[in-house]
């Protein structure tokens, strides 16, 4: 403790900027880890909180997928003796221009046994449910929603419904708290039968909430309700909806977890690099302490204590930075999940997990200690005479090089074995880790070889400065090995993400070219993912009657539980659609599978469904419909990007018979050859736009929407590029600072014999650019290997679709000038420090 106060603290005050740079690695690694995980948890917590508050006193909920079920199910449930109350619900979200509004359609006669509506004042229209029912334009809103839009009781609120533009009247304002706080307070309640008309649901309910008699066993009640309703219905506690959403969004969660963990790994390497540099720089101080009688244990303890203090401070700042990052990311993630999965999200309060914070603190502290163990032990073990010498400690010993290469060879062989047996998921991850470890261990040797290769080039460009810069890297690889390794890892991550994005874009573009060929898509919302509103099937005849319309294909899409996961079922007229589009078969014969699907003898599944859920050709799938189970064999597998959990393509006739639902989500419209597209679009809007909620999206608008979602999905690539640049700047500044300190006498002698200040500057600049070049070369090479594993992991565990390997040369070409520019900028400060130092002190340094 005395050494820490007398030696470490004065050093930290003297080199405050350097200490801050050392802690920056901890801040970055911990911050990214905490930020990504907290943002994900906050989005899930907001969704679960909304479910819990909407559920009220409900202990069970009856659902049958997105399509809903007939009204007569309610009477059956109410006959069960264990059921105290059963209330039907329609739930949908609409855009209000500012944000999303969650609308609950409820039966006011029985719903108060489930939910409590705590209203401001006393409104007769609400106190008497019959009066509320008699006024179908009635609406209750939360106080938050009313205040934001300056609404009061009897205020009018226009909304676009499936009955056209309608004006609703605010009959009551709910006090804050409880139900009114669900969905961030953006909530409205209306009569369920008015909601059926508003959203085009017909005589159907989305779900039924059930409150049980006191003392009734939840498991017994679940079995009785399930037995009564039969197959095709899900009878579960309200919390299961959150589990289903978590299953739906698992791909994003897994992708973000992988990215954040790799970012943390890079941050850990920054920590190791910065602590190793700090210990190496002070080896003369270590020698003096040893000469004065300090034991090896005391030296080791001193530097471990320094690392622990730095780790704690850096971790604390990193946690704070992560919380700020989570606030920015939560809204982004919520919006992305809304657009992709069609489940509206609202940004609630951040959910801070004490276990996560504790884990982050433990990881930051443990990483700091582990990072300091090796250099501290190495410094403590050096002879005091050698510790006071310059330069020798920066070279790697023969034994150290051999050990590194032997371990790298072992890890490389392990990675090749994993490559050969890569059909197993766990083996792929092991191979990925071994390949990265092999690259890290080989990086000092490869950096040495590349520095030797650069020397003649640098000497030709600047005979004196270039040779000095290259010799500095060749003679002292220990000083820059950590910086180069961290830069290599960062760039490899950028390349792997960029390559994955490029391959995904190419596959997506090919799918859109084949599958999205209609001229127009007639939808109920401005995005294809919204399923709150549906059209009546009869609208197809009206669209066909429009002048210039050649063909209309109705499409219904609903999510149902297949293989314990919410899977998208797409119902359409397979015979008609297959004449316009034919997705190539991944498995099976294309003509045969479309024929069998049209004859209702089988189902076509997407490749990602087959991979993610272990389905295979000929397997009979059990698809739950209200009151029955539809059993169909898989007759073909195709590439389809319609849903990230997978899709099932079946004939519309089957859907009509099993779901008793003729509603439509989207009409695919083809115009006659030679017809004016703009005029046909306007005719559709003129004929139906005022009668119901209807949007006519062009082919280009739909493609742009899908491409924009993909851009958002791969937005993390930009974040990782920024991290890579930051890694380059931090690492190079540290490495050059130590280089200047270590070579102070050398640089002083150079100036004393006539060297110009500009020559010193050029030497430092060229050394920094050389570090950048070596890091870029190694990073682009490791990125090619890492991209292979990323493609395999994405194919097997994330998207489930075979993505072709495609090296992102464009990304690589952008990275080269960015990293070299960052390296040059990072060298400006250390270069000025080198030329402005005292010449007398430099010559007296030893």
Where do the language-model regions lie?
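Short beta-strand boundary microenvironments
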Residues: 101-147, 529, 537-546, 550-617, ...
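Small-residue transmembrane helix packing/gating motifs
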Residues: 54, 131, 148, 176-214, ...
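Hydrophobic, regular-secondary-structure patches
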Residues: 19, 23-108, 126-135, 147, ...
